[in-house]
Amino acid sequence: MIIERARELAVRAPARVVFPDALDERVLKAAHYLQQYGLARPVLVASPFALRQFALSHRMAMDGIQVIDPHSNLSMRQRFAQRWLARAGEKTPPDAVEKLSDPLMFAAAMVSAGEADVCIAGNLSSTANVLRAGLRVIGLQPGCKTLSSIFLMLPQYAGPALGFADCSVVPQPTAAQLADIALASADTWRAITGEEPRVAMLSFSSNGSARHPNVANVQQATELVRERAPQLLVDGELQFDAAFVPEVAAQKAPDSPLQGRANVMIFPSLEAGNIGYKITQRLGGYRAVGPLIQGLAAPLHDLSRGCSVQEIIELALVAAVPRQADVSRERSLHTLVE
């Protein structure tokens, strides 16, 4: 349902999706598909000559797909550097114009300036480089202290869709960071799925069944979430089965408001989250879409370097949903006014 909803919104209001890791057969196939079916307006950031040679060597068409060369667009780089300076002040590097000749930095600047709706990277670049470009050029959302990520775990055969966080950014989150991750993930889930989040703060303990500093960290994070968002349905600490299986929840956490039906799982550490999503993906009959980066002031998202063409397409679609939902609401309001 999540991908179907994203496709419907994409057809109504195709987003401008920029790909900085463009010299990749998977990206060219994904961009061609998105363009062909009117699901997005892809932009490839690369040297046109290098991209043309790459496409020819792989016998691929690039008809109608926009290509922007950061090296030959000095005026754009100068304009982006001015925005960077206005936002970051003295933290802006003196060679900002030169740094923006890097495709990843340039693409981040495009979404920061509103000249693209979404940036999808990471198919060739490391997560560290993607996050560095986002933090340096885009910066954090006002009031945000913790950058994090969420995977959408989609069933291939049966079962509910789930959100898994944080699986790629914060190695050992504090209680305050876990609370930030939970709140950001709840917002992302609501924006992309249109459903109310039911958040489980995961641990190896359920309702105090074990005592350990790591358990206490999750318990403290849960209380912080409740204080900051009293309307949010959240519980913790819970083991995965107590969060996901109603029959187990009835035994281990009978008073839990989630009743074993959580849809957003907050892992206590990056180690647990990364292992958990890969096990779910490889053994559990689920496919992973993401990770969607949470906390940046503009949408920049990070693929796994082992991603497939389908995963690139799906991330491009779901990442654009919040913007497209806003466009649809604006059009509906405009129609009502008329």
UniProtKB/Swiss-Prot annotation:
EC identifiers of the protein: 2.3.1.8
Top class in the EC scheme: transferase
GO MF annotations, alphabetized: phosphate acetyltransferase activity
Tagged with keyword Electron transport: no
One Pfam family in the UniProt entry: PTA_PTB
pH relationship of activity: Optimum pH is 7.2.
Keywords from the named record: Acyltransferase, Bacterial microcompartment, Transferase, Virulence
Alphabetical GO biological process terms: ethanolamine catabolic process; generation of precursor metabolites and energy
Subcellular compartments: Bacterial microcompartment
Quaternary context: Homodimer.
Name of the protein this chain belongs to: Phosphate acetyltransferase EutD
